[in-house]
Each structure stands twice: as C-alpha cells, then as structure tokens.
Amino acid sequence: MSELSTEELIAQKQSWLTQDVSNLKVDIVFSDMDETFLHTDKSLDAKNMEMLDRLAELGIPFAPCSGRAFNVLPKEVVNHPASKYVVSCDGAIIRDLSTQTVLHESTVTKEQALELYQKLKDYPVTFDIFADGGVYLERSRHNLISQLGIPAEHAAFMQRSRTPFDQSVEEFIDSVTTIERLGSYWSVAEGEKYQALVADAVASVKGLSGTASMSMGMEILAEGTSKGAALQWLCNYLGLSTENAAAFGDSLNDVAMLSAAGMGTAVANARREDFEAAAYITLTNDEAGFSRFLTWALGE
C-alpha cells in the first residue's frame, strides 16, 4: 500500500498527461467494459470506438476483458475489426474471434456449482449461472433483482442480460455443457451481512474463489482464474511480452490485470486498489479515459 493520499496517487500516476512523448511500445490492448470502456450508463463512447478504428489500422489486437458472459458483451465492440480475442467471465474463457474457438478455459465444475447452491439457496440472494456463453437464473430469483436496491441502470442491465428458467437448479445445471462462472447479488441495505454469508459459503467449497466488481455482488470463479492470469496466458500464447500490453480497469476484478500488464491503466473513477496496482491513471470512463491514454501511448 502506498502512503500517498488518493489525490497524491492520482496526481503522480497522471503525470503523463503533461508529457508530449510516451516512448512506449503497445503490442496488445485489453480493457474491462463496464465503468471503464463504456460510459456509466452502459453506452459506447465515440472516442473510444474511434481508438478501436486506429488500433485496427495499426494492426494492434484488442481484447475486451470482462466479467460479462460472451453473449452479453457489447456487439459493436466484439464485432469491431480491432477485436481479435475476448476474455469473458473474468478470465474463465479466452476466445479467438477469427475462428470462434475457445483457446483456454478455467471453469467451475457442476459439482462445485451444486454444492454452492445448496449453501445459498435459502438466502434472498441471486444465484447467477454463467454457462455456454449466456447467463441464467431461476425465475423467482430473477424477480428478486428489482428488490435489491441496486442502481437502476445496473438492475435493468441485469434483468436484460439474465435468462430466467423454470426448472430446478439441479436440472438446469445438468442440462448445460460448461459452467464458466457463478455470481450472486444481494440487498444493498443488508450488504455487509450477505457479503459475509456469501463469502463464507464460497470459501467453504474447495476450488472456488470470489471477486467483486460491485459492493453488492460477488463473481465466483474457479480458483486461480482472473483477468490477470488470462492476460498473461494470452500474451504467452501470442509470443508477446506483458510489458508491451496495455490494460484498462476500474474494479477489484481488474486489479490482477492491471498488475500483470506493463501499461496497467486505471480510469480515474476506479477503486483505490486499482490505483495502487496500475502504472498509470487516465481520465474517467465518462471522459474517454481509454482513448486519451492510448492517444498518448501510441504517440498520436
């Protein structure tokens, strides 16, 4: 932990804003989506999309790197010519977009999912199943989303992106091929209580670990899975140095990725932990911080 105040840390890691020349070499770019590449209201930023155009022109591969399931990622980003790979479900799946094949996976077993469900089923929390590229939820828990006190924009996104099912969880889990990760959200008003209960339940299932992108939810992964591990795996697969990787993020689930990348860059709306892990801090997600840093890094 730095002894600097948050304001001092930001000032130190934004000093690049006053420098004309970067002398950096960017070979690949990774970015979180929500609260980082996207506006807070989940809309696309025109400057960030223009930067993807520039990356495509330069032949620099871009990899959206998100806690979202593949089918829930912004289509305009996934289908952009710059996007060559996708890291979805916090690093559980790495996909090559040119061939639509999964290059690497680090997934949750059906047995682990069922064991965790048994521990959480009596709590008023969601039990989100990220499987086969989609997100699924018991209908009764889907109806719970609107009652949790989650910010309206995010609650609406959750409802849109999750497909309710009417069969039992056991039957549903049996019907899918691959469980990429799990997730659980709880009431904002009782956040501390349920955060502790869910964290304890996750810790009691061998081979699972939890990370968070919001204070009222937990993203549940196979142990050892992270965006950072995925970044390192993909750079190694492509024969690229992580020193020449730029990565952007804002949440706890981005810390490992920002640490792993030579040009780990936190948006100014990120958490203190991201500021600590990053080499650089850029502008906020609503100020096209992604584009602003890369404009400088690429010497544009």
Q: What are the language-model segments listed below?
A:
Residues H80-A82, C89-D90, S98, S204-K206, ...:
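Short, structured coil segments at secondary-structure junctions
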Residues K42-L58, E105-Q112, F165-V169, A222-N236, ...:
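Short, acidic loop-to-helix structural element flanking the phosphoryl-transfer center
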